[in-house]
């Protein structure tokens, strides 16, 4: 039975007993591909044309990188297209100059989102669409900050660093 390839990262899945003298090389290649998926970075110029990322079996591919930085001055509306059926998490940086144009990060056949110039976004592909991970989509609460008794001393506050303009009325109380 011949090797097959994983659906998302295209890692080689060796059949039992296959590659008797080369399994180490193939395993090392898979580990390098995992490293690319977890920590890979690539800068991609998107100024003059749409870019379709590739994910090929058992070889370094730009769609496998965790972090993608988009650069260039957009000459028109641009799209960065992730292959369909890839399920993966991305961090994308829009380091382009838009000049009234847009930059969209999406799958080839599905939907995605428009990047804002100068921002870094987290996003995931579910194999059909790409969704931005925004702070307003996360849940949980942030507790109220408290300062312990005797935590602030004169030695810790430089002269003129605390002014009434920096402290709203009634912001400091003895109640905890």
Spans of features found by a protein language model:
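Extracellular/luminal recognition modules and glycoprotein regions
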Residues: 61, 113-114
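Register-specific beta-strand positions within repetitive beta-rich fiber domains
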Residues: 47-49, 135-176
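Ser/Thr/Gly-rich low-complexity blocks that favor extended beta-strand/coil architectures
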Residues: 86, 99, 107-113
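Extracellular disulfide-bonded cysteine-rich modules/repeats
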Residues: 22-29, 116-126, 153, 163-164, ...
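A short, sequence-level motif marking secondary-structure junctions
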Residues: 84-85, 117-121, 138
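Exposed extracellular interaction/assembly regions and N-terminal maturation sites
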Residues: 2-102, 148-153, 171
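Residues on the solvent-exposed faces and adjacent turns
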Residues: 70-72, 94, 107, 117, ...
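Short, surface-exposed terminal/edge motifs of secreted or surface/virion proteins that either
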Residues: 31-41, 99-107, 122-136, 164-166
């Amino acid at each position: 039975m011949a090797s097959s390839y994983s659906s998302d990262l295209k890692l080689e899945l060796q059949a039992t007993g296959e590659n008797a003298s080369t399994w180490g090389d193939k395993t090392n290649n898979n580990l390098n591909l995992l490293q690319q998926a977890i920590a890979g970075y690539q800068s991609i110029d998107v100024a003059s044309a749409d870019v379709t990322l590739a994910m090929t079996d058992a070889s370094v591919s730009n769609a496998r990188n965790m972090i993608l930085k988009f650069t260039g001055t957009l000459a028109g509306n641009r799209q960065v297209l992730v292959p369909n059926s890839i399920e993966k998490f991305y961090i994308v940086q829009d380091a382009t100059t838009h000049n009234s144009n847009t930059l969209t990060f999406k799958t080839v056949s599905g939907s995605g989102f428009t990047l804002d110039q100068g921002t870094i976004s987290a996003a995931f592909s579910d194999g059909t669409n790409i969704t931005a991970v925004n702070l307003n989509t996360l849940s949980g609460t942030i507790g109220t900050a408290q300062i312990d008794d005797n935590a602030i001393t004169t030695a810790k506050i430089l002269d003129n660093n605390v002014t009434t303009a920096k402290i709203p009325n009634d912001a400091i109380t003895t109640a905890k």
